[in-house]
């Protein structure tokens, strides 16, 4: 979802957005002047782990300015009955140092004029290079759920995270595993980052890694709390990856992390991630959102009866991943393309939906079933469900990365109120028949020509894939060939809602083709509905259609 800062969030972030320099402008009528602060003994105070009182003196350059002091953390509190410049620092029980702030505001305008930084040592009397910072909800108003946005990256594509809930399947005890949470921020500037969690079994130290820097945070107690991680400078808008790994624990678990919170200037644009609201709309949403956005080319067809659609595909080695469908020849009633299954098998899939609407193939009446007319060698035929139902076939031919493959699909009415769909695949220097299906109660030519790129297993969504579709042609019922050089880029609902932003389309001019790219949390993005035109190859396919029709069916 596009998470744009609303007015409330902007007000909440008021304290952190303005410069932390000790000075700002005070507007009085038509006069504008700079208000600076003199802070003694220093605007940075180091406190021992046992805590105690700290005091300071703040003098504004304009004596008429009344000051207001606001602490950013619960462990820094004003001492009751004394001046606002005398504060009590609670004992730090963690082995990690921590950092908090006292913001100094103009009492009338609430403009931030400066701040005092409080750095408290750990129980061992040390200050880490990246001390633990503390934020309140105003500092980090945007919540990013762990579920829906997190994946196992060590070991990669492992099963510790449940496919449907997006949470750890079991108690988090293993310190060798690493989960990674991804989200997209739309602006540059500082980003406050915090984790939300609890640990009812004791205390734990959890390590977070962001852009090659690590931060250790102590999580303790049964009540969920906001634990500050760091303020991170963001120099380029795009995806942020937060790695999480357990370091040590006193109890059974490293704790329960429900998500992260972000704030600051970098988060004040369009942010993209899977939200809690979207996941609760349907119990399957988390599963589908974690798969990433499927992306499509919708080809511009001529105003005539189209009988055949021809397409070519190229998948290079670095883009071959399990659970990928590089669909080549889609039509209004089905599709055909190359696949790498979840187990790594390379197949060619051809499917035709039944005109009877159901997700259960056994519910289809006999007169509404898609019927097999022919099938080729090394082809398996069956039924499918869960996305409509119908006839399905697989050619087992072991396609190879880096090789250009050709596909041809025929859609033709039989004159009796039905339509016949036939798919061919060119490999090993010959055209191979996949299957021919009859779809009842259908009278149509080839319509809705499209291609798409799909990841069908959430664990593999962390890997970027791209595919080249090139040299598209259609053959009309009249026998004439027409080249297809225009296509519209679209994506599925995960992309439309802005839950994922890592998808794009482009033209490969050298190869006269269209490129689809998605997954992997890249920063490449294309606007939904953008029209692309590729260069013309000018050379129609050379196909012996009589020979195709005479390929024998294999029982």
Role assignments for model-derived ranges:
Residues 77, 123-398, 406-413, 417-555:
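Extracytoplasmic
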Residues 4-12:
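Sec-dependent signal peptide recognition
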Residues 13-44, 110-138:
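Bacterial Sec-dependent N-terminal signal peptides
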Residues 97-108:
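A short beta-strand micro-motif common to beta-rich folds, especially ectodomain repeats
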Residues 36-41, 56-87:
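Surface-exposed binding patches on compact interaction domains or structured appendages
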Residues 45-50:
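Short, solvent-exposed loop/linker segments at the N-terminal edge
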Residues 90-97, 233-236:
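Surface-exposed, short loops/turns at beta-strand junctions within beta-sandwich domains
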Residues 107-114, 251-254:
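Short, exposed coil/turn segments at beta-strand boundaries within extracellular/luminal domains
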């Amino acid at each position: 979802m596009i998470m744009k800062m609303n007015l409330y969030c902007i007000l909440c972030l008021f304290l952190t957005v303005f410069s932390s320099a000790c000075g700002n402008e005070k507007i009085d009528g038509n006069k504008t002047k700079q208000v600076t602060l003199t802070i003694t003994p220093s605007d940075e105070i180091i406190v021992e782990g046992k805590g105690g009182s700290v005091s300071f003196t703040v003098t504004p350059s304009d004596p008429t300015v009344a000051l207001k002091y606001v602490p950013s953390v619960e462990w820094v509190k004003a001492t009751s009955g004394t001046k606002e410049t005398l504060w009590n620092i609670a004992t730090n029980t963690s082995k990690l140092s921590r950092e908090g702030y006292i913001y100094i505001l103009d009492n009338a305008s609430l403009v931030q004029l400066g701040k005092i930084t409080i750095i408290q040592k750990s129980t061992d009397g040390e200050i880490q290079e990246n001390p633990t910072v503390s934020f309140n909800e105003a500092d980090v108003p945007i919540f990013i759920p762990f579920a829906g946005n997190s994946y196992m990256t060590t070991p990669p594509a492992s099963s510790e995270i449940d496919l449907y809930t997006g949470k750890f399947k079991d108690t988090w005890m293993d310190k060798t595993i690493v989960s990674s949470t991804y989200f997209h921020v739309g602006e540059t500037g500082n980003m406050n980052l915090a984790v939300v969690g609890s640990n009812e079994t004791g205390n734990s130290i959890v390590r977070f890694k962001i852009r090659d820097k690590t931060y250790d945070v102590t999580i303790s107690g049964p009540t969920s709390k906001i634990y500050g991680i760091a303020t991170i400078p963001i120099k380029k808008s795009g995806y942020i990856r937060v790695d999480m790994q357990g370091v040590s624990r006193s109890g059974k678990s490293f704790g329960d992390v429900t998500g992260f919170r972000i704030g600051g200037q970098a988060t004040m644009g369009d942010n993209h991630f899977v939200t809690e609201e979207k996941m609760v709309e349907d119990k399957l949403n988390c599963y589908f959102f974690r798969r990433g956005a499927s992306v499509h080319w919708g080809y511009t067809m001529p105003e005539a009866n189209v009988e055949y659609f021809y397409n070519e595909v190229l998948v290079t080695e670095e883009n071959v991943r399990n659970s990928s469908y590089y669909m080549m020849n889609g039509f209004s009633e089905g599709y055909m393309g190359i696949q790498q299954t979840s187990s790594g098998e390379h197949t060619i899939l051809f499917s035709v939906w039944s005109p009877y609407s159901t997700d259960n193939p056994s519910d289809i009446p006999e007169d509404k079933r898609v019927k097999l007319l022919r099938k080729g060698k090394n082809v398996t035929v069956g039924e499918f469900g869960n996305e409509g139902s119908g006839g399905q076939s697989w050619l087992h031919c072991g396609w190879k990365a880096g090789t250009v493959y050709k596909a041809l699909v025929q859609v033709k009415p039989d004159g009796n109120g039905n339509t016949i769909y036939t798919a061919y695949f060119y490999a090993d220097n010959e055209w191979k028949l996949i299957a021919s299906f009859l779809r009842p109660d259908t009278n149509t030519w080839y319509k809705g020509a499209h291609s798409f790129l799909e990841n069908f297993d959430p664990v593999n969504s962390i890997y970027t894939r791209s595919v080249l579709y090139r040299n598209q042609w259609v053959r009309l019922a009249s026998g004439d060939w027409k080249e297809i050089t225009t296509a519209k880029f679209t994506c599925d609902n995960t992309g439309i809602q802005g839950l994922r932003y890592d998808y794009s389309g482009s033209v490969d001019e050298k190869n006269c083709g269209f490129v689809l790219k998605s997954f992997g949390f890249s920063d490449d993005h294309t606007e939904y509905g953008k029209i692309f035109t590729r260069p013309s190859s000018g050379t129609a396919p050379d196909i012996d259609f009589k020979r195709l029709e005479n390929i024998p069916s294999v029982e």
